[in-house]
Amino acid sequence: TSPKRYRKETSYVYSCGWPPVFLGDLNYYLEDYDLTTVAGEIDTNRVGVHILSAEYDCSGTAELGQAAHQAIAGSTFQEMKNVGHFPMSENPKAFLEYLLPTLDRIAAA
């Protein structure tokens, strides 16, 4: 699990957002936008797509990440264990364990 101090800080920072803005964010990514309609058009020869989905992300689940990966030919996918929606701030050390190898693969390509 993520260190408590990072979880608390992340929760505090996120809760400081103006509530109507947050509601707009939720509406956009839960209702308005559907990647599945255009995912197959993404050309990974022109732009790399590397999907890192968090085990404890309730809005962007690992299942949704896997589905996006399957819809985007040439993409990569990895489920990040023991982190949530904000892995970079809630557990930076754990996040780097997933991010750095991904960046290494990009640099080697």
Please give the residue ranges for each predicted region.
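A general structural signal marking secondary-structure boundaries and capping sites
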Residues: T1, Y33, L103-A107
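Conserved serine/cysteine hydrolase catalytic core
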Residues: S2-Q70, T76-E79
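Catalytic active-site module of serine/aspartate enzymes centered on a nucleophile-bearing elbow/loop
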Residues: I72-A109
